[in-house]
């Protein structure tokens, strides 16, 4: 049997809509991600378990893990009879790359089970394709960091899908999931079809400056450039209490904050553990909406998807 863990990810990071994402892991050792197990069987079977298994589609063929198995078999040109188990530990529609976790874990597990017939680039292309079935368009800003680890910039040129951007060891990512669902497709539909020239210029300046600051090792500058003129002005209305939360975490000392992915998770970036804890405490009291919500203090997950059994 092969068991693969795929970590949560925070896409966009305010500054890089659809082209930037970071894999994250809680500092307390909690596993924030999905696990998929694969073993040989006489015919295909899929079993779901985990905290959020009851939120999955009741029809097995609608489960993204089934679709991953089906697409992987197509890529190999043969049917591979396996029993798969999805441990769904990630809330659906959370802005933490929940579907990417399932897609990445499933495809890596299948590839490991079959002796790695597909290389990383081919696997990543399949991951983007399958993630696109859920979100409505192919994009790699969750699947790439989830699969490869660290902070990833989408390239999509010369056969290169993404490349790693150096992060900062001192950065702590406070992630607050309020417990409500925001559909990725809905969050994309709310965005305008066209943008003003000044917004395009500002977006280009912020993203170019952020990447420069990462490579020139200027964490304060990098954090200051994490501004969103593309999605946040339109998506903030989908998130109860978001504007107040951003103001509060800034006053506490967060370097930057914004919407993780398409929301509703909020991320806040800190460079001191005590600041991160104060931010986490405030968000726990004021941003969470129900018992399904949670707050984690995280660092970059540099390993990405890995075999755990």
UniProtKB/Swiss-Prot annotation:
Enzyme Commission identifier(s): 2.7.1.39
Gene3D superfamilies found in the cross-reference section: 3.30.230.10, GHMP kinase, C-terminal domain
Residues spanning the signal sequence: none
Pfam families referenced in this protein's UniProt entry, alphabetically: GHMP_kinases_C (PF08544), GHMP_kinases_N (PF00288)
GO MF assignments: ATP binding; homoserine kinase activity
InterPro entries found in the cross-reference section: GHMP_kinase_C_dom, GHMP_kinase_C_sf, GHMP_kinase_N_dom, GHMP_knse_ATP-bd_CS, Homoserine_kinase, Ribosomal_Su5_D2-typ_SF, Ribsml_uS5_D2-typ_fold_subgr
Record's keyword terms, sorted: Amino-acid biosynthesis, ATP-binding, Cytoplasm, Kinase, Nucleotide-binding, Threonine biosynthesis, Transferase
Pathway this chain belongs to: Amino-acid biosynthesis; L-threonine biosynthesis; L-threonine from L-aspartate: step 4/5
GO terms of biological process kind: threonine biosynthetic process
Function, in words: Catalyzes the ATP-dependent phosphorylation of L-homoserine to L-homoserine phosphate.
PANTHER family cross-referenced by the UniProt entry: HOMOSERINE KINASE, HOMOSERINE/4-DIPHOSPHOCYTIDYL-2-C-METHYL-D-ERYTHRITOL KINASE
Protein known as: Homoserine kinase
Species in which this protein is naturally found: Salmonella typhimurium (strain LT2 / SGSC1412 / ATCC 700720)
Gene: thrB
